[in-house]
Amino acid sequence: MEMHFASVWETISDHIPDEPALICDDDIKTWKEYDERAAKLAFFLDEKSISNDSKVGLYLHNSNEYLEAQFATFKVEGVPINVNYRYVEEELIYLLDNSDSEVVFFQSSYSERIKKIADKLPKIKAFIQVGGTDLLDLKNCYMYEEIISKNPSLKRKTRSEDNIYMLYTGGTTGMPKGVMYKQGAFMNSLLKTAFAMGFDVPESHLDISETVSELSAKNMLSKTIVACPLMHGTGMWLGALVHFFQGEVALLFLNLGLTQSFY
């Protein structure tokens, strides 16, 4: 039994490779593309010695790239760290330092903010810019799409269900705090929600893939609008993670605010 996010998604991508997994505006990625792009990012992370329990900050808006970067981090048994894009400099420094983040994926619109805090984050091995045409003039800064285009895919491997999944809370009780879960136990809790509508709770990632294949054969794979920010627990857990267990599509909006996205 291997209940691990990366292993589950890899198996789903093998069973329904040509089905869409991510849609953000006009950018559609199939499950095969989702897996392959994440594997190339994972190769880069592995080259930077990101491995079991290494932390990777996701300072991003809702986007395909957010979920690809998260998948890549899981592939190397790292821990994705959700970063609130509304944080100002001091909050960002605290969060990234407190979490021991070693890599940060950041939206290009926050380049200047990253530049201001970079020298106060000595643990960071790489800053990865998502979007924009000009790469931020900063040491150890890389363009997201160039990483994917220049690197091979990291080979798959067996992973531990004891790998950590972490969610940083907001600052309603002071500074942000990281809540840690073992992936196997956390996934089983999510699956009880995902399969509350008549499906048996699966015992392994292979059981999940069988359900996904059945839904695909019956043309019953659906789309889920991720309305909440992925950097919030609600947006990630109910907007993406639960639905991925059924091979569903995560429908994302890059623009902040639903009004801008729909009209």
Where are these regions (language model features)?
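A short N-terminal helical cap/helix-turn-helix that marks the beginning
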Residues: 1-21, 36
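Flexible, low-complexity linker/hinge segments
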Residues: 1-3, 135-163
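A short helix-loop-beta submotif of the ANL/AMP-binding
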Residues: 61-81, 85-89, 97-103, 222-223, ...
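Conserved pre-ATP/AMP-binding loop-to-beta segment of ANL
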Residues: 151-168, 174-175, 214-223
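Conserved AMP-binding/adenylation subdomain of ANL enzymes
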Residues: 189-226, 231-263
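Conserved AMP-binding A3 loop
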Residues: 30-32, 164-204
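Conserved AMP-binding/adenylate-forming core of the ANL superfamily
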Residues: 18-63, 70-71, 88-93
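Structural core segment of the AMP-binding/adenylate-forming
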Residues: 47-48, 75-146
